[in-house]
């Protein structure tokens, strides 16, 4: 009993340190898996993609959110305009090919405009890594405002995922629909 009293403070101190360490290991963990449409249109793990976590201010977050929404709207409008000019249901192979080419051009313009928006925060990268063979990635970050950028080139495609992150406890992403993509071949 006397021995227990003597070491009780030490035992409680070590227990507190262990709890702090365990909680720290689980807090603000950002993990995810990324896939993109393959040549058969089935989702394929995006292995070897560059994953970057950028820290940003509240003002930057608002500007980027507004710019992303605006760019997405412009891209959809261009595709709608293309569909009015070149019918997807056309029997003519040339017409369908022209529609695909113009849509790819719209996607390419959208991606380049998105890259320009992201240039504002590129100097604030806090973590970088690549996805493994199953498309998995993971970071540990302090609480704050972040943007997650994932860039890959599967099957002759350029794909870019942009996600805003506000890590709380353990944030897990399952990304399959890129923010923008285009064909590198025509």
Question: Which residues does each PLM region occupy?
Answer:
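A short, amphipathic beta-strand motif
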Residues: 30-38, 51
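Glycine-centered loop-to-beta-strand initiation motif
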Residues: 32, 131-139
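Structured interaction patches on ligand/partner-binding surfaces of diverse proteins
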Residues: 130, 151-180, 186
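Extended low-complexity, serine/threonine- and proline-enriched intrinsically disordered segments
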Residues: 47-76, 81-102
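A short beta-turn/strand-edge loop motif at beta-sheet boundaries
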Residues: 40-47
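A short, solvent-exposed beta-strand micro-motif common in secreted/extracellular proteins
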Residues: 135, 143-154
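Short, acidic Ser/Thr/Gly-rich low-complexity loop/linker segments typical of extracellular
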Residues: 61-77, 81-83, 109-134
């Amino acid at each position: 009993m006397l021995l227990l009293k003597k070491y009780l403070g030490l035992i409680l101190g070590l227990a507190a340190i262990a709890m702090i360490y365990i909680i720290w290991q689980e807090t603000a963990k950002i993990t995810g898996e990324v896939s993109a449409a393959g040549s058969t249109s089935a989702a394929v793990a995006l292995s070897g993609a560059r994953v970057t976590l950028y820290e940003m201010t509240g003002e930057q977050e608002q500007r980027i959110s507004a710019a992303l929404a605006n760019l997405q709207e412009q891209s959809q409008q261009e595709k709608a305009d293309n569909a009015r000019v070149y019918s997807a249901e056309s029997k003519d192979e040339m017409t369908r090919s022209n529609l695909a080419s113009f849509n790819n051009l719209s996607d390419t313009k959208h991606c380049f405009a998105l890259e320009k928006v992201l240039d504002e925060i590129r100097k604030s990268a806090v973590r970088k890594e690549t996805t493994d063979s199953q498309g998995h990635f993971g970071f540990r970050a302090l609480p704050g405002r972040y943007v997650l950028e994932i860039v890959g080139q599967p099957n002759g495609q350029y794909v870019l995922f942009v996600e805003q992150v506000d890590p709380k406890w353990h944030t897990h992403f399952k990304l399959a629909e890129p923010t923008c993509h285009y064909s590198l071949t025509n």
